[in-house]
């Protein structure tokens, strides 16, 4: 078991501990539960889906990286496939506050980058901030997404974001988590191809500036993140953050990164290079390359 889970795990009910122990045994537990695993946990504990998600939130929050605030937020995004995806907030010392990842963004990106097609619900241990409510409004589940908070009845996103502004106001038809392929040819080595593939999946209807980042770890594992724009612009999630979300949730740390590649267009209206390089250098990665999409 990864050390970060030990404290939270010890506080779980005995029957949940017994059912989870084999799943958490791998130090690189992928921070997700398949539909089959969810069903097994429900059977072992007698909990329904909502109660189980709340019980698991401390494990999601244990994935938080909060050296600045020390305020750990956990989220669990429930995919329509039946898979549950953990998420947690991340702060980056030496970078800017704007590079921060919120727990809801983490769980949603985890699901999206894992190939999930849509979300049915999200469970969070604290009320979503306005930034996250706006981020969620970009999803193809829209204002119908169910939000579950401790001690409250579940409500749809529309209840947390009345008079919402979103992609439909800008006549955007393709939404976040819809399947997209921008068709750039995969060239170069495996890391370059992973970055290009991530750029191909970008959700960037506002700027038309595709980008993707791929991180190579010392053991050869590659994590890639795609750019995810938002109708309100500021809640946009850069591609580096997508890759760092996966790296963190899969049990890796920043010193494990040995090389990074950003794929983007040289003439795009928005450029990721400076912010990507600065944040990676703050995390200790200095081997950073750029592949230009043609």
Swiss-Prot record:
The keyword Hydrolase appears for this protein: yes
Gene Ontology terms for molecular function: cytidine deaminase activity; identical protein binding; zinc ion binding
Keyword Transmembrane: no
Catalytic activity field: cytidine + H2O + H(+) = uridine + NH4(+); 2'-deoxycytidine + H2O + H(+) = 2'-deoxyuridine + NH4(+)
UniProt function note: This enzyme scavenges exogenous and endogenous cytidine and 2'-deoxycytidine for UMP synthesis.
Oligomeric form and interacting partners: Homodimer.
NCBIfam families: cyt_deam_dimer, PRK09027.1
Name listed for the protein in its UniProt record: Cytidine deaminase
Organism: Escherichia fergusonii (strain ATCC 35469 / DSM 13698 / CCUG 18766 / IAM 14443 / JCM 21226 / LMG 7866 / NBRC 102419 / NCTC 12128 / CDC 0568-73)
Lineage of the species this protein comes from: Bacteria, Pseudomonadati, Pseudomonadota, Gammaproteobacteria, Enterobacterales
């Amino acid at each position: 078991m990864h050390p970060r889970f030990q404290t939270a795990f010890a506080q779980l009910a005995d029957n949940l501990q017994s059912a989870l122990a084999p799943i958490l045994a791998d130090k690189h537990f992928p921070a997700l539960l398949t539909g089959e695993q969810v069903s097994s946990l429900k059977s072992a504990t007698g909990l329904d889906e909502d109660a189980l998600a709340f019980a698991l939130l401390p494990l999601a929050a244990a994935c938080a990286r909060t050296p600045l605030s020390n305020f750990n937020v956990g989220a669990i995004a429930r995919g329509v496939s039946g898979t549950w995806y953990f998420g947690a907030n991340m702060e980056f010392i030496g970078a800017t506050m704007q590079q921060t990842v919120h727990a809801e963004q983490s769980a949603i990106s985890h699901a999206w980058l894992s190939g999930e097609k849509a979300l049915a619900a999200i469970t969070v241990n604290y009320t979503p901030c306005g930034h996250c409510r706006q981020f969620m409004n970009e999803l193809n589940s829209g204002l119908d997404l169910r939000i579950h908070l401790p001690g409250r009845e579940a409500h749809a996103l529309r209840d947390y974001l009345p008079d919402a502004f979103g992609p439909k106001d800008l006549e955007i038809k393709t939404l976040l988590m819809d399947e997209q392929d921008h068709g750039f040819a995969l060239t170069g080595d495996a890391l370059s191809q992973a970055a290009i593939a991530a750029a191909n999946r970008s959700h960037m209807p506002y700027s038309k500036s595709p980008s993707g980042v791929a991180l190579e770890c010392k053991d050869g594992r590659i994590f890639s993140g795609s750019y995810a724009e938002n109708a309100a612009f500021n809640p946009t999630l850069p591609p580096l953050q997508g890759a760092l979300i996966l790296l963190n949730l899969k049990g890796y740390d920043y010193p494990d990164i040995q090389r990074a590649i950003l794929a983007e267009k040289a003439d795009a209206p928005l450029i990721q290079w400076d912010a990507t390089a600065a944040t990676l250098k703050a995390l200790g990665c200095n081997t950073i390359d750029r592949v230009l999409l043609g």
